[in-house]
Amino acid sequence: MPSADLVLPAPMSRVAVVAPTSGARACLVELARAGCVELTGNLPPPEGEAVEALRRLGGRRRTNGGEPALLDRPPDLAALEREGRSRLLSGEIELQRHARLGLPHHSFTAWLGWTPATEVGPLNERLAPLDSAVVELTPPPWAEPPTQLRPVPIEQPFRPLVQSY
């Protein structure tokens, strides 16, 4: 009989994601694919051509509804609007909002965030081909990391107690 699962928080690391400014989009798309980095900062309001295209789609029948999606390369927004691709338009809007959280410095841009400590190495492997990297930072004393829960078998915490009898 399978055991029930207990969820415990995963240890989180404060990180900076650094990418060449020319490759910022590719870096953010890869971060979205990985799905394990929570960028920090106040997201700016949506703006731009993608927002207007999505608003115009509001009165028409949409296709591909659901979660936002991204393409590797910048899409033709007019074509997405004609095709009713609201998921891709929504994804572009979110990508642009997160891109504006970046802190540019010369030819690089950096984003601050949190990720599970176990994901730092795998993220660096994913970002290396894009000339990007994840750097662990010491969190400020006042910062409290977000909580990400991970399931663990319930009997593991009690195993020493049971084995002692």
Question: What is the role of each PLM region?
Answer:
Residues 1-165:
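Long, charged N-terminal accessory/stalk domains
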